[in-house]
Structures are given as C-alpha cells and as structure tokens.
Amino acid sequence: MRRRLRAWAAIVLAGCASWFGSARAAVDYWAWHPNVHLARILDDAGRLYLFEGELLVRGGDTLFQRRGFPPPTASPHPVVLVYRLEAMEWPEPLQRQVERDLAAFEAKRNQVWGIQIDFDARTRNLDRYGELLGQVRARLPARYRLSVTGLMDWASQGKLEDLNALQGVVDEIVFQAYQGKGPIKDHRRYFERLSVRGLSVPFKLGLVEHGQYDPDAL
C-alpha cells in the first residue's frame, strides 16, 4: 500500500508515508505542535505520530526539553511517540523519559505502536547512527516498534549497505520530502532514485500538506 505523509502548515507537520506504485493512499499524520486539534484527523487515518520532546545540546551538555502532547484517552488511531535529537546520543535520562511516556500513553488505553527518532544524521555517518539505533532497539521492549526519519540525501547518496543494515533494527524509515512549508527541491529525481535503489528496510515518504508535488512522481 502506498501511504502519503501530510503536514499541517508551518507549525505542524502531519506525517504520512508512501510505497511506490500503489493505487490508493492511506494517510498517517505527524503532529509537531501540541496546539494542533487532533480532532481534524480523518476517521480512516492510520497512525498518529506525536512529537513528545527533544534532546538539546547547550554549552556542551545535553538536556531533554519536553514539548509534546499529553496522552489522549483511548485514541482510535495507533500512536507513535516522536523524539528529536540534536546530538547522536541516547542518554540514560532520555531513556527513562521514554519509558515514562510509553507507560503514560498505555495507561490512557492508547494503542502504542512504538517510538520514532528524528535526527538528521549526515549521510556519511549512517553506519555510526545505525550503531546508536541498535542500542536504542536493544532497550526498547519487544512489543514496541522503532521508526526513524531520514534525509532524502540518504535515499540518493547513502551507501546501500548502511541503509539495509538497518533492517531488523528499525521497522521503517520515513524520508522527509519537504523543506520548510514546501516540497524538497528536485523531489522527482529523489523519488525516482529511491524507487530503484533496492532498500530492504520498509520506508515511507513524508510529504508536506498542500505541497505542489509532481503527481507523476508519486
């Protein structure tokens, strides 16, 4: 099934994903700002990716800043908790925070799919990033899945062996096909390259809502 990722305007991104060559798009959503009214999500939407906070680097130290959504009660959509990283690190305080968040969402009777890590790893550092993700996966209870966002440069320039090494570590990569409020430049070229690369790890495309994408490229 092809999925499209939508994004809500400037403050909020609604996320979705896509497989090449399918007939109809199912829609998942990213929500990056707690002021978003989740009620606007379609009844037949798929997963709901909720931003919960970020690991910041300040003065050489890392600290976690909570910016996220409080747990809804019995969401009809499976939820994914999203954490943004400014550094390629997964410190113990963040691990404990993630564990608390997962427990809090489940206590509200939500179906928690897992977590997503949003980190713009440089393409040449994909192998090192894969090692960190392996450590995160090892500490994540088996019932939860692990998603990561990815740069479109990964798709076109990353070593295929580094990307495919993520199979069994992550359950999906969501490639970010946008810049700011619009589609990424030369998105058709990126999509064509991605479609023939032979990735073994499941992937999706993150598209900005109302973005002027080339329909033939999707």
Describe each region flagged by the PLM.
Residues 2-218:
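Secreted glycan hydrolases and related glycan-binding modules that recognize and/or cleave
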